[in-house]
Curated annotation (Swiss-Prot):
The gene is uppP. It comes from the Bacteria. The keyword Transmembrane applies. This is Undecaprenyl-diphosphatase. One of its GO terms (molecular function) is undecaprenyl-diphosphatase activity. It is found in: Cell inner membrane. It is a multi-pass membrane protein. Its EC number is 3.6.1.27. GO terms for biological process: cell wall organization; peptidoglycan biosynthetic process; regulation of cell shape; response to antibiotic. It catalyses: di-trans,octa-cis-undecaprenyl diphosphate + H2O = di-trans,octa-cis-undecaprenyl phosphate + phosphate + H(+). Keywords: Antibiotic resistance, Cell inner membrane, Cell membrane, Cell shape, Cell wall biogenesis/degradation, Hydrolase, Membrane, Peptidoglycan synthesis, Transmembrane, Transmembrane helix. Catalyzes the dephosphorylation of undecaprenyl diphosphate (UPP). Confers resistance to bacitracin. InterPro entries: UppP (IPR003824). Belongs to the UppP family.
């Protein structure tokens, strides 16, 4: 593989990762499809995916840095209150939402990694699509938590339980958490913001664990390729998050569900 070819692959996968990581469409499903299409499916490819996820995480940190630092008691000016109640999103909300998936993820880490096959991803895309539809059709007519600061500890924990579904490769972490949030009475916009903020510790923890287990596949010659993928994923994710938060006020998740079904069909035709 030539250096130019490697950098092109890194750029393409960085775009795919950045576009899909925080949308309810499954970044894993897209990475598997595009990775197979590019012929980039070895152990180095898995390590590469872990590293470019850090670029996507950094995009969330840049978007919500005041809120994130505020959660740990470091304040850079006043964070605007989002909601109709006197509540405030606290670190305890995030910790409660993390517990279910962290416990299951640690216990079944090796089992989960063994599920990274197109057939499993295809099923997850379909089931996750139906969950998005269920969230739109069954959500309360009037959300109890309109803004991010209205979310209760109980709602945060329930969102965390839904997040466990994302341990199934191809399900979509954002799809599971946003759908779960809507079903327990959180507005679509607030559930999306909470999902993005929750992604930082969840993805960071999973990424560090994966990186620890696969660091021996790294070499200095891979640095340019990984750097291109990281930077590309960061920039594209930043644009994707900003755009998503704008359009989600005006559209439902039905188009995303339909898109998931289409991607599942592509997986079936290509890999089955």
């Amino acid at each position: 593989m030539t250096d130019l070819h490697s950098l092109l692959i890194a750029f393409i996968l960085g775009v795919v990762e950045g576009l899909t990581e925080f949308l309810p469409v499954s970044s894993t499903g897209h990475m598997i499809i595009v990775g197979h299409w590019l012929g980039f499916v070895d152990e180095k490819a898995k390590t590469f995916e872990v590293i470019i996820q850090l670029g996507s995480i950094l995009a969330v940190v840049v978007m919500f840095w005041r809120r994130l630092f505020g959660l740990i008691g470091i304040h850079f000016g006043e964070v605007p209150h989002e909601g109709h109640t006197a509540g405030r999103l606290k670190l305890t909300h995030i910790l409660l939402a993390m517990i279910p998936a962290v416990v299951l993820g640690l216990v079944f880490h090796d089992v989960i990694k063994s599920l990274f096959y197109p057939q499993n991803v295809m099923y997850a895309l379909v089931v996750g699509g139906f969950l998005l539809l269920a969230a739109e059709w069954l959500k309360p007519k009037k959300p109890r938590a309109v803004g991010l600061d209205d979310i209760t500890h109980r709602q945060a924990f329930m969102i965390g339980c839904f997040q466990c579904l994302a341990l199934w490769p191809g399900f979509s972490r954002s799809g599971a958490t946003i759908s779960g949030g809507m079903l327990v009475g959180v507005s679509r916009y607030a559930a999306s913001e909470f999902s993005f903020i929750l992604a930082v510790p969840m993805m960071m923890g999973a990424t560090v664990l994966d990186l620890y287990k696969s660091w021996h596949f790294l070499s200095l010659s891979d640095v340019p390729m990984f750097a291109v993928g990281f930077v590309t994923a960061f920039l594209v994710a930043l644009i994707a998050i900003k755009t998503f938060l704008k359009i989600i006020k005006r559209i439902s998740f039905v188009p995303f569900a339909i898109y998931r079904f289409i991607v599942a069909g592509v997986v079936y035709m290509v890999f089955m």
